[in-house]
């Protein structure tokens, strides 16, 4: 077996892992959102989290085996990010899972096979760990796999025993480590030595149930949960010193370094830490915003805000003074879009959120940094080593300066912050807030279960009624419970009964009105929290009071559109199973009033012919006027009849079945047409990939078709008018314009180079002779970095033995400097990379490159003459 595994890119590692297990009957599933279903955690923190209900016996899995590459975010070790080799906030966890199917022996065998035969690790480079009491796993590694006993380490419960909580499913685990230095031998192996070992694959064997007394009882159905860190595998296979220098992260770091005008490899450790923090955190924020998390002061929104602010501050620490996060985000989007196309689809939202947060925080920094500097000076003058909690709270309360940022700046100045004092001030502030309101025990964001004793849960009537008389049980303003609300107010209303469908199963909530004696509320959305339907809307007239009797009326036109799109989604899945592959299953969906979106598991793109056939099949079923049959059945009976369930979805003992006989039968709680003919027509707009092994179809149906056609006609007409051609001539005209643009860009680049060369040729007569060498040091006006480099190379070629240093300001506050040295100059001990990096610091930048040719950047254009003057002086001193 090779001890020199082949280089693989991050994307290749991900695909190799998923395909390995797909070939072994595992269903490839898309990464779940970073917003988890589990209410006990803010963010998806592990590859197994989406399957936790299955492991806990709360859901019945559709598949016995699954494999995923799961996006994860953890911030518990945020202070270590950039300071260690492998700590991250964002990471990808590759995993294979068994739900009551294969167990320990097979999981270990496949873990070893993919490590040695697929990724090419030599057995001599691998060490495994087992739980100290797991003799079974120890024997499998020793007897069946053949791992030497000296390279099987028994570890305690803290390291090698997985638990889901104080009670419940649990079990031992076994980890595979890569050994960078097997030549050091097998004696005194210390797996905590991260200079030698890195754990890259964890196999969890869920085989016990732990009761309240701590007793372990074997589970009837044993499960497998594994995790392979993608970034760690990339570090090993790409032979780089840490996770940050892999192709998954380093291009982001390089982008940040380029903006700062510095070179990563020649930077000091403090600068490298800041660059790593930026590289890591930008990955997190891009994926968080792509998963529709918005920055705020609570929950996961606060995590996002904190990460963005850390990016901005570390940008300042490396010399970036203006806004830059959207540029770095573009690099992260480009790296991620092949595996997660939603980041490109959400590009505008990502950049808008970043720009808004960065702009606001820069103002916060400007206001707060000056005061913090004064506080630090005062603390030092007093001989103290701690910033008071009161001072830290003033920064937070008055200037919006986060406590974490105050703590970071304090640490850089060898000070601490009185966090307890800060919290005490915060409690005083909260007390003032509580005094201003009566008891607040109802929030839209949180669970409403605690109100079950005080108000009636909502009875849903929407399957059979479009209007209903109801009682107002609760009114909320910005999540705060109120007894009444006035006209013009945005409110959330809980009714005792409602015809409004609440957002669920991919279908958005109904729209409509709540009205009563002098009251009109426009309902703009409906969401379900526990057993309560929360109606979001605006009071257009009157005063709304708890206990009022009102009429709740949905907008029938919106409901018809949603029903048409939802039933069309069911028909679409049935058509995909019939025409493309019977094994296709739903991976996600969106049913709105104007369109539908259906994500499904499929390892390849559909052909144009398949897309057309699917569309034709759906329209055929619509034309055949199939009547709907709706039943509520026991879950087992529904599945026995062949009803399609969504993998990982939680179902009760009884389920609602939507059946269009001989066409489609699914478990579904949404609203549907009573006959397929009501849909009218169905049109596929697009088919594309959204993740590895997951495709997405977007379509329109019913009344929304007319909106789509009108919009398309308007776009075509606008383009035809703009280009002054007939609609059918547009493709040729656009192709022609694209060709002209490419040619113009090439001509422009050529002209730039020619202009730079022309400017540089005039410098030949300014060459000075120093010893046996000629030197040229000069500033060229408005020359871009690439053309400046070409000019320097040409000048050096003409003078032969010598050195050329050129500088330019291609745009405001951006300096470019190039150094080109002949071999004779190199022999004098001058290296272009080090030389140009040193003089660029005068302009507030840095850079580097090869001994004979190097380039650097800076931010202070006013200092360029000083930098070039220093370059000339240094060259003359060294070459004389």
UniProtKB/Swiss-Prot annotation:
A Pfam family: tRNA_SAD
Location in the cell: Cytoplasm
Cysteine disulfide partners in this protein: none
UniProtKB keywords: Aminoacyl-tRNA synthetase, ATP-binding, Cytoplasm, Ligase, Metal-binding, Nucleotide-binding, Protein biosynthesis, RNA-binding, tRNA-binding, Zinc
CC cofactor: Zn(2+)
Record text on cofactor binding: Binds 1 zinc ion per subunit.
GO cellular component, one term: cytosol
EC top class named in words: ligase
Location (main, coarse): cytoplasm
UniProt-recorded Gene Ontology molecular function terms: alanine-tRNA ligase activity; aminoacyl-tRNA deacylase activity; ATP binding; tRNA binding; zinc ion binding
Reaction equation(s) it catalyzes: tRNA(Ala) + L-alanine + ATP = L-alanyl-tRNA(Ala) + AMP + diphosphate
Family: Belongs to the class-II aminoacyl-tRNA synthetase family.
UniProt function note: Catalyzes the attachment of alanine to tRNA(Ala) in a two-step reaction: alanine is first activated by ATP to form Ala-AMP and then transferred to the acceptor end of tRNA(Ala). Also edits incorrectly charged Ser-tRNA(Ala) and Gly-tRNA(Ala) via its editing domain.
Stated name of the protein: Alanine--tRNA ligase
Native organism: Nostoc punctiforme (strain ATCC 29133 / PCC 73102)
């Amino acid at each position: 077996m090779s001890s020199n595994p082949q280089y693989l890119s991050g994307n290749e590692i991900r695909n190799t892992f998923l395909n390995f297990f797909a070939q072994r009957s595992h269903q490839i599933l898309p990464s779940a959102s970073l917003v988890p279903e589990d209410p006990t955690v803010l963010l998806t923190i592990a590859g197994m989290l989406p399957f936790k209900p299955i492991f806990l016996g709360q859901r019945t899995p559709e598949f016995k085996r699954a494999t995923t590459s799961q996006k994860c975010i953890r911030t518990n070790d945020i202070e270590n990010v950039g300071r260690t080799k492998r700590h991250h906030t964002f990471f990808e966890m590759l995993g294979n899972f068994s739900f009551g199917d294969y167990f320990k022996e097979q999981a270990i065998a496949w873990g070893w096979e993919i490590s040695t035969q697929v990724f090419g690790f030599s057995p001599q480079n691998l060490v495994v760990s087992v739980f100290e009491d797991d003799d079974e796993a120890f024997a499998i590694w020793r007897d069946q796999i053949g791992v030497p006993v000296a390279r099987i380490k028994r570890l305690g419960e803290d390291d090698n025993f997985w638990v889901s909580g104080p009670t419940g499913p649990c079990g031992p685990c076994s980890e595979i480590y890569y050994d960078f230095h097997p030549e050091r031998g097998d004696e005194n192996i210390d797996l905590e030595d991260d200079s030698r070992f890195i754990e890259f694959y964890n196999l969890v064997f869920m085989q016990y149930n732990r009761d309240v007394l701590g007793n372990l009882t074997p589970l009837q159905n044993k499960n497998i949960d594994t995790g392979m860190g993608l970034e760690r595998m990339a570090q090993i296979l790409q032979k780089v010193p840490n996770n940050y220098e892999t192709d998954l992260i380093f291009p982001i770091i390089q982008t940040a370094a380029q903006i700062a005008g510095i070179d990563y490899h020649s930077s000091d450790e403090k600068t490298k830490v800041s660059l790593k923090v930026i590289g890591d955190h930008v990955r997190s924020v891009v994926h968080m915003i792509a998963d529709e998390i918005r920055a705020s002061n609570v929950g996961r929104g606060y995590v996002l805000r904190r990460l963005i602010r850390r990016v901005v501050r570390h940008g300042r620490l490396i010399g970036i003074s203006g806004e830059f996060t959207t540029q770095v985000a573009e690099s992260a989007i480009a790296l991620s879009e092949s595996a997660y196309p939603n980041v490109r689809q959400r590009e505008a939202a990502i950049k808008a959120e970043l720009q808004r947060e960065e702009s606001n925080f820069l103002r916060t920094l400007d206001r707060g940094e000056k005061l913090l500097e004064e506080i630090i000076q005062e603390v030092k003058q007093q001989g103290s080593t701690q910033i008071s909690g009161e001072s830290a709270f003033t920064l937070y309360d008055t200037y919006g300066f986060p406590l974490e940022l105050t703590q970071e700046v304090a640490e850089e100045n060898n000070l601490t912050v009185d966090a307890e004092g800060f919290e005490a001030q915060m409690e005083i502030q909260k007390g003032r807030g509580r005094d201003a309101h009566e008891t607040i025990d109802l929030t839209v964001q949180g669970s409403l279960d605690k109100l079950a004793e005080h108000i009636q849960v909502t009875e849903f009537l929407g399957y059979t009624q479009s209007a209903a008389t109801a009682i107002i049980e609760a009114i909320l303003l910005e999540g705060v419970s109120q007894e009444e609300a006035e006209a013009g107010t945005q409110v959330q209303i809980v009714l005792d009964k409602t015809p409004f469908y609440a957002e669920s199963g991919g279908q958005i909530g109904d729209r409509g009105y709540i009205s009563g004696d002098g009251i009109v509320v426009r309902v703009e959305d409906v969401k379900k929290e526990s057993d309560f339907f929360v109606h979001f809307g605006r009071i257009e007239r009157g005063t709304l009071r708890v206990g009022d009797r009102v009429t709740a009326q949905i907008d029938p036109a919106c409901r018809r559109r949603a029903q048409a799109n939802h039933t069309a989604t069911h028909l679409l899945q049935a058509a995909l199973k019939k025409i493309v592959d019977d094994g296709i299953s739903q991976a996600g969906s969106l049913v709105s009033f104007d369109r539908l979106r259906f994500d499904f598991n499929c390892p390849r793109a559909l052909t144009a012919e398949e897309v057309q056939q699917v569309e034709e099949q759906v329209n055929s079923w619509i034309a055949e006027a199939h009547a709907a049959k709706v039943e509520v059945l026991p879950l087992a009976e529904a599945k026995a009849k062949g009803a399609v369930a969504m993998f990982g979805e939680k179902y009760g003992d009884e389920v609602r079945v939507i059946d269009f006989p001989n066409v489609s039968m699914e478990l579904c709680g949404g609203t549907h047409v009573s006959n397929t003919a009501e849909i009218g027509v169905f049109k596929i707009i697009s088919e594309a990939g959204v993740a590895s092994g997951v495709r997405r179809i977007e379509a329109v149906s019913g009344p929304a078709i007319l909106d789509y056609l009108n919009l398309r006609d308007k776009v075509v007409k606008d383009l035809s008018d703009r280009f002054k051609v007939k609609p059918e001539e547009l493709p040729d005209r656009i192709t022609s314009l694209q060709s002209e643009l490419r040619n113009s860009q090439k001509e422009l680049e050529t002209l730039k180079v020619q202009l730079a060369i022309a400017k540089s040729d005039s410098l030949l007569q300014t060459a000075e002779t120093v010893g046996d060498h000629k030197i040229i040091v000069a500033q060229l006006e408005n020359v871009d970095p690439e053309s400046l480099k070409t000019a320097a190379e040409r000048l050096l070629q003409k003078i032969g033995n010598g050195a050329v240093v050129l500088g330019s300001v291609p745009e405001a506050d951006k300096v470019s400097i190039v150094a080109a040295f002949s071999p004779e100059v190199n022999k004098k001990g001058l290296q272009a990379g080090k030389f140009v990096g040193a003089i660029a610091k005068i302009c507030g930048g840095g850079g580097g490159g090869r001994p004979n040719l190097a380039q650097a950047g800076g931010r202070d254009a006013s200092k360029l003459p000083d930098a070039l003057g220093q370059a000339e002086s240094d060259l003359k001193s060294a070459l004389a």
